[in-house]
């Protein structure tokens, strides 16, 4: 087994690993009394700029330009209008970049550069931070930089005043991945006194490293099993189900490994869960809880726990503000945020229907199923069904293209979401009659 190829096969893993020593250095410098708060902001910002240029090359401009514009917007707009205008600018910019990917993939039929994929991934994370910051300002939780037009301060003072916001948008531990950190938590971590700054827990980092090693070994074993089988276009019945489940497991193992690596980088820099939570600070939200994701029999719980910080961001940004069809609007926006590929649109809309069905099915079961043997059987069956439906959705989203989506829809695997869809129709009709 080529271990070097195993751990650095994905470019994001390579660049996240390359940033690790600098995260440890930042943590060490913060313990020193001579490392001022302004120096911390500059270190994080400079590290983000260097990492962006190293990972994205000339495409890094697609990150720097919206970050600069976002800081300008939050500096000069009033709190009442800052979120709306910032949101539409950021999503418009991201959509244009995704349309460039569509043009290259579907019209030209050429594979886009790897650096462009990394840029789009980082741009999606930047959108999270920009909209989170603008929401905080709009809700009065965070103060915007002083208004340049109304203030008589010099231009350099305005730049220093905007430094925390600019550093937040581009700080290197979260540039390429990681749980969404609010501006308030980011500011509290950076401004924490040297005596209160958390020391590096090498035991926690070692444990995360062992988890990544185990996940990567599982990926190698599963990849060999998947590659030896048939494809979705020529599989038959149970073989199609096994192929879908094992391929989805490959995707999940990749996500788990990346999320743990991202969490390790944030921890090494002092922004992880081990940093604790002081008065007025927001808690750290990890993206992955493997045990909950793999043992739950509820599709709705899986949706809330999968990429948890993003799920909370979508809930705050879309779900709570939607007056009609909040669930559908949330998943539709998620498809827009991911790039509006055919498989993504179908996958996320299917997911919203499955979550709605999940609520009705489990509400009905809690009333009708009383004995514990039947409850145990029900839980086992719904767990298996949940895992297979999630695998179906994952293949649709990750396949992206229309041809891959057609292969998936024409396979026997479509039986599982169709079954939940029929139950949704029957239970919704029963609920309407009772009302």
From Swiss-Prot:
Changing residue 191 to N: Does not glycosylated. Residues 1-5, 57-59, 102-120, 228-240, 339-340, 398-407 are lumenal. Changing residue 433 to R: Does not affect protein cleavage. The record marks 55-56 as: Cleavage. Changing residue 149 to N: Does not glycosylated. Highly expressed in stomach and pancreas. Lower expression in small intestine and colon. Very low expression in testis. Disruption phenotype: Mice display a complete lack of octanoylated ghrelin in blood. Its EC number is 2.3.1.-. The keyword Endoplasmic reticulum applies. Residues 27-40, 77-82, 137-206, 262-324, 358-376, 429-435 are cytoplasmic. It comes from the Eukaryota. Not glycosylated. Changing residue 338 to A: Abolished ability to acylate ghrelin. Does not affect proteic cleavage. loss of serine O-acyltransferase activity. Keywords: Acyltransferase, Endoplasmic reticulum, Membrane, Transferase, Transmembrane, Transmembrane helix. The chain crosses the membrane at residues 6-26, 41-56, 60-76, 83-101, 121-136, 207-227, 241-261, 325-338, 341-357, 377-397, 408-428. One of its GO terms (molecular function) is acyltransferase activity, transferring groups other than amino-acyl groups. Inhibited by 1-[2-cyano-3,12-dioxooleana-1,9(11)- dien-28-oyl]ethylamide (CDDO-EA) with an IC(50) of 60 uM. Inhibited by Fe3+ and Cu2+ and the O-acyltransferase activity is completely blocked over 5 mM Fe3+ and 0.5 mM Cu2+. It is a multi-pass membrane protein. Belongs to the membrane-bound acyltransferase family. Monomer. This is Membrane-bound ghrelin O-acyltransferase MBOAT4.
